[in-house]
């Protein structure tokens, strides 16, 4: 087999040529121009909004806040996600173009926070709805912590392969029984038809014993006679 001899490059040519791969170039362009979607439901968004000011200046990271999901590739779920807000969040995520990333910001977003014990209307973890890339704990996280989370996301983007990013994400995304959602195949189906498994019961279906389970120690007749009103 004939050996192939490559031409010897002079010093000037070596200093003006950068060798890289198309995948690395794509990763560099994406990590340098993350456009976050303005999505906030609680106090954590106040900390994120402070990044826009001159003190932290998150423009130096190439972050451009957008109000449309079709122009964003990053969403920071800042704040509590309620049951009524869950379908809207999934719809916003589905409308974002690929590749897209998610940062779960705050304890309420990650685990439900202080609402995770006995709340009937709070989603206990946003990762039950959409895939999460970076978890940012705190109540609320400081702006410095948000910058650190964005830095970690940039490092993750720098070493990822695009084929791995567009693979089918979680063939079956399951919703907890407590939240009473249907089990759907994927969040990236283009449909946002998550509905409650059981329709809410009306007040007419509630028995009198259940409705008046906790009675006042003073009857209404005694309260009227004593002039309490």
Swiss-Prot record:
Superkingdom of source: Eukaryota
Gene Ontology terms: cellular component: chloroplast thylakoid membrane; respiratory chain complex I
Free-text cofactor note: Binds 1 [4Fe-4S] cluster.
Reaction catalyzed: a plastoquinone + NADH + (n+1) H(+)(in) = a plastoquinol + NAD(+) + n H(+)(out); a plastoquinone + NADPH + (n+1) H(+)(in) = a plastoquinol + NADP(+) + n H(+)(out)
EC number(s) reported in the record: 7.1.1.-
First-level EC class: translocase
Keywords annotated in UniProt: 4Fe-4S, Chloroplast, Iron, Iron-sulfur, Membrane, Metal-binding, NAD, NADP, Plastid, Plastoquinone, Quinone, Thylakoid, Translocase, Transport
Role, per record: NDH shuttles electrons from NAD(P)H:plastoquinone, via FMN and iron-sulfur (Fe-S) centers, to quinones in the photosynthetic chain and possibly in a chloroplast respiratory chain. The immediate electron acceptor for the enzyme in this species is believed to be plastoquinone. Couples the redox reaction to proton translocation, and thus conserves the redox energy in a proton gradient.
Family membership: Belongs to the complex I 20 kDa subunit family.
Name of the protein this chain belongs to: NAD(P)H-quinone oxidoreductase subunit K, chloroplastic
Taxonomic lineage from the root: Eukaryota, Viridiplantae, Streptophyta, Embryophyta, Tracheophyta
Name of the encoding gene: ndhK
């Amino acid at each position: 087999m004939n050996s192939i001899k490559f031409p010897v490059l002079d010093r000037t040519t070596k200093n003006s040529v950068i060798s890289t791969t198309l995948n690395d170039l794509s990763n560099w362009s994406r990590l340098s121009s993350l456009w976050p979607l303005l999505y906030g439901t609680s106090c954590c968004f106040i900390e994120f909004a402070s990044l826009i000011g001159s003190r932290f200046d998150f423009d130096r990271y190439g972050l451009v806040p957008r109000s449309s999901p079709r122009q964003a590739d990053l969403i920071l779920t800042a704040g509590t996600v309620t049951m009524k807000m869950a379908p809207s969040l999934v719809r916003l995520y589905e409308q974002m173009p690929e590749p897209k990333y998610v940062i779960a910001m705050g304890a309420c977003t990650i685990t439900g926070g202080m609402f995770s014990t006995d709340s009937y209307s709070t989603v206990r973890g946003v990762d039950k709805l959409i895939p999460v890339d970076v978890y940012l704990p705190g109540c609320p996280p400081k702006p410095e912590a948000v910058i650190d989370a964005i830095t970690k996301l940039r490092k993750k983007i720098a070493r990822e392969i695009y084929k791995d990013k567009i693979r089918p994400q979680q063939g079956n995304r399951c919703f907890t029984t407590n939240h009473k959602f249907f089990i759907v195949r994927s969040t990236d189906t283009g449909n946002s038809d998550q509905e409650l498994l059981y329709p809410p019961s009306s007040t007419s279906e509630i028995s009198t014993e259940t409705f008046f389970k906790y009675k006042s120690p003073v009857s209404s007749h005694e309260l009227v006679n004593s002039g309490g009103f």
